A protein has these predicted regions:
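Structural motif
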Residues: 142-146, 198-207, 267, 311-317
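Beta-propeller fold detector
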Residues: 100, 152-168, 214-224, 281-284, ...
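N-terminal Sec-pathway targeting helices
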Residues: 1-14
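Beta-propeller domain segments
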Residues: 66, 72-73, 80-107, 114-117, ...
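Asp-box/WD-like beta-propeller blade repeats and closely related beta-sheet repeat scaffolds
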Residues: 176-177, 199-241
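Beta-rich, blade/repeat-based domains predominating
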Residues: 118-131, 171-186, 228-246, 285-301, ...
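Conserved beta-propeller blade signature
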Residues: 133-137, 188-192, 246-250, 301-305
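Beta-propeller domains
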Residues: 94-104, 132-167, 212-213
Length: 368
């Protein structure tokens, strides 16, 4: 009887010990809702003390495990190792694509951050084909390149390119500010960069002459549009080749609700920029956060993808004409709704959010 009771006590203590360890440890199951709830209500300082004082050996093992994972990730990224290789067919069976994924020597996207997107912004990376090379820039301004033919191998064998972006970023909090796009044309590399100065944060374009050893970026285009609220997610920043000697550049509305429909402001616009004289022209207005941009020259068609409010993402077609500036409706028309966390009274006063676009003189999205 006593023996069975002792065994039961040992089992209960072991279960409680394991459960408590899973709550205070850093290597917990991020999908377990019960553990997530308990971790929220237990102060992190208390959890750390428990780990350091009571769970000394398990804590050291856990730290060692996490460290080994980090070292392995670094080694994989440093070598540019292939970790996924699969051939897939289109739904109609007419096309086949070979999908490959490689590790890169940059911080990775943390899918557990959810809507804390500002923390993920530094982990977004951008690539561009540059002649027979592929250039990659991290959100924090690290630049590398590798031969295009290396995607057929097991390793990218990338090489680092030094640059002066650290000097450009040094005045900013890197979590919130950084690269938003990478574009190459005619021996020049262009970067759209979210940065800040005494007026607030803004989106600008920098340019550097192609150099595989060192890139010296200089300010190419200054938007002179600043956020009025300090919120830095609706920035746009896409660069795309356009007609003649021009590029297209998308600028988010930067929380400037009253400026989006004004032709005297660049907030919420897609513009063209002449690369020689920097002359800018409005191409379309009424945008919230245009981050996808493509120019189909044969059709004279500008395609842009738009991040709207909840349920309001759009694909927009603009058959370009010099005689007309197209209007896509924001913030008057949108098929989205305010997010639950947003002030509905503010929305009602500043944003109309009519569902129809055409009824109010705007272009309807092709898809939303």
């Amino acid at each position: 009887m006593k023996k069975n009771f002792l065994i039961l006590i040992v089992i209960v203590v072991f279960i409680l010990f394991s459960a408590f360890w899973s709550i205070v440890s850093e290597g917990y199951d991020k999908q377990n809702k019960s553990i997530l709830f308990l971790k929220k209500i237990i102060p992190s300082s208390l959890a750390k003390k428990v780990r350091d004082k009571i769970f000394v050996i398990p804590n050291l093992k856990e730290k060692n495990r996490i460290l080994n994972i980090q070292v392995k990730k670094y080694e994989q990224g440093y070598k540019g190792i292939l970790f996924y290789d699969e051939k897939i067919k289109s739904t109609n069976k007419k096309f086949e694509a070979n999908i490959k994924k490689f590790f890169l020597p940059f911080p990775r996207l943390d899918l557990n951050l959810g809507w804390n997107a500002e923390k993920n912004s530094k982990r977004a990376h951008y690539l561009e084909i540059v002649d027979d090379k592929i250039f990659v820039a991290s959100g924090l301004g690290e630049t590398i390149y590798f031969d295009k033919t290396n995607i057929n191998n097991q390793e990218l064998k990338q090489k680092k390119i030094f640059n002066n972006l650290e000097n450009i970023f040094q005045k900013d909090n890197k979590i919130f500010f950084g690269i938003r796009d990478l574009f190459y044309e005619n021996n020049y590399i262009y970067l759209s960069i979210l940065e800040s100065d005494e007026k607030g944060f803004t989106i600008n374009i920098y340019r550097a002459k192609k150099d595989l050893k060192n890139l010296e970026f200089k300010l190419f285009f200054k938007s002179n549009e600043y956020s009025e609220t300090g919120y830095n997610l609706q920035t746009g920043g896409r660069i795309e080749k356009f007609e003649k000697n021009k590029i297209l550049f998308s600028i988010g509305f930067l929380d400037k609700y009253k400026s989006v429909q004004s032709k005297n402001s660049l907030a919420g616009k897609i513009i063209s920029i002449d690369k020689d004289n920097l002359k800018q022209e409005l191409v379309s207005i009424g945008h919230r956060n245009p981050q996808g941009l493509y120019f189909l020259k044969k059709k004279n068609l500008i395609i842009n993808t738009e991040h709207g409010p909840q349920g309001g993402d759009e694909i927009n077609f603009n058959f370009f004409s010099n005689s007309e500036i197209k209007n896509f409706g924001w913030p008057i028309s949108s098929y989205g709704i305010p997010y639950p966390s947003q002030d509905k009274n503010f929305y009602e006063k500043n944003i109309f959010l009519k569902k129809s676009h055409s009824q109010y003189g705007f272009l309807e999205p092709i898809k939303y």
